[in-house]
Amino acid sequence: MTETTKTHVILLACGSFNPITKGHIQMFERARDYLHKTGRFIVIGGIVSPVHDSYGKQGLVSSRHRLIMCQLAVQNSDWIRVDPWECYQDTWQTTCSVLEHHRDLMKRVTGCILSNVNTPSMTPVIGQPQNETPQPIYQNSNVATKPTAAKILGKVGESLSRICCVRPPVERFTFVDENANLGTVMRYEEIELRILLLCGSDLLESFCIPGLWNEADMEVIVGDFGIVVVPRDAADTDRIMNHSSILRKYKNNIMVVKDDINHPMSVVSSTKSRLALQHGDGHVVDYLSQPVIDYILKSQLYINASG
């Protein structure tokens, strides 16, 4: 497949990130490597979206702290960014709402094709530049002027870098304004972009708990967007999917990262990290990056069981 015929992917991870761990970052890396090896996808960005403060989970520290820790954790990445939208809303947002927000945002700022996982490329949803009258899809048959793959990828990369890769100094605590004027964007037929939910097998298993998830939301998340699962603790994802009629229905939309490498970070969790911090366990350096540890100690977070 050529670069332009491959599906371009943005991986979106929702969660508490209380705190964000090395395991979370490795989850992104493993998912990207796996998707690239399939030969069908190009991962062009990763988004960390911390949950709103009103989520109500015991021990959840304020979103301001969690956003800063996430920013510190990804500061050396050239493709993963932290998005504050979910935290800045008036109340808690469903995972489905967060996915839809980012899909709509990508339509506005990239102008490229955004497809649902089940939508064939001949019937795409076309992104429109904000505050601009819709124009016909590019149909110029003049080879000399028609966008090349390099031009297409360059334009998409330019737009995404403005919203996905802006890394302001943490102390200023200013994030990119999603409504900022990004200028006129070109529109293309050649690029197909999807936003996939990135999660661990624990979230996948939560889909099987009766009443925990809204079934209509599950249909959209799995049926329209699709999921990339990075298993934890050697979880049996096939068994998990067989316990949910919706997961069985859309099993082809669920990509499970499978590799032969033993990943020690797959057993790292935020809970384990908090316990290590509370008990002064030196193994915390195996769970969290040093900038995150330094911030936690400076802010005196997680020093007791209540967070």
UniProtKB/Swiss-Prot annotation:
Tissues expressed in: Highly expressed in brain, in particular in cerebrum, cerebellum, occipital lobe, frontal lobe, temporal lobe and putamen. Also found in the heart, skeletal muscle, pancreas and islets of Langerhans.
GO cellular component: axon; cytoplasmic vesicle membrane; cytosol; Golgi apparatus; Golgi membrane; late endosome; synapse; trans-Golgi network
Residues lipid-modified (S-palmitoyl cysteine): 164-165
Pathway entry: Cofactor biosynthesis; NAD(+) biosynthesis; NAD(+) from nicotinamide D-ribonucleotide: step 1/1; Cofactor biosynthesis; NAD(+) biosynthesis; deamido-NAD(+) from nicotinate D-ribonucleotide: step 1/1
Post-translational modification note: Degraded in response to injured neurite. Degradation is caused by polyubiquitination by MYCBP2 after recognition by FBXO45.
Membrane topology field: Lipid-anchor
Keyword terms, alphabetized: ATP-binding, Cell projection, Cytoplasm, Cytoplasmic vesicle, Golgi apparatus, Lipoprotein, Magnesium, Membrane, NAD, Nucleotide-binding, Nucleotidyltransferase, Palmitate, Pyridine nucleotide biosynthesis, Transferase, Ubl conjugation
Enzyme Commission (EC) number: 2.7.7.1, 2.7.7.18
Needed co-factor(s): Mg(2+)
Main location: Golgi
GO MF, one annotated term: nicotinate-nucleotide adenylyltransferase activity
UniProt activity-regulation remark: Inhibited by P1-(adenosine-5')-P3-(nicotinamide-riboside-5')-triphosphate (Np3AD) and P1-(adenosine-5')-P4-(nicotinamide-riboside-5')-tetraphosphate (Np4AD).
Biophysicochemical property: pH dependence: Optimum pH is 6.0-9.0.
Record note on cofactor: Divalent metal cations. Mg(2+) confers the highest activity.
Keyword Phosphoprotein: no
Binding site for ATP: 24, 271-274
Enzyme class, broadest EC rank: transferase
Catalysed reaction, written as an equation: beta-nicotinamide D-ribonucleotide + ATP + H(+) = diphosphate + NAD(+); nicotinate beta-D-ribonucleotide + ATP + H(+) = deamido-NAD(+) + diphosphate
Function recorded in the entry: Nicotinamide/nicotinate-nucleotide adenylyltransferase that acts as an axon maintenance factor. Axon survival factor required for the maintenance of healthy axons: acts by delaying Wallerian axon degeneration, an evolutionarily conserved process that drives the loss of damaged axons. Catalyzes the formation of NAD(+) from nicotinamide mononucleotide (NMN) and ATP. Can also use the deamidated form; nicotinic acid mononucleotide (NaMN) as substrate but with a lower efficiency. Cannot use triazofurin monophosphate (TrMP) as substrate. Also catalyzes the reverse reaction, i.e.
Similarity-based family: Belongs to the eukaryotic NMN adenylyltransferase family.
Subunit-structure text: Monomer.
Name this protein carries in UniProt: Nicotinamide/nicotinic acid mononucleotide adenylyltransferase 2
Organism listed in the record: Homo sapiens (Human)
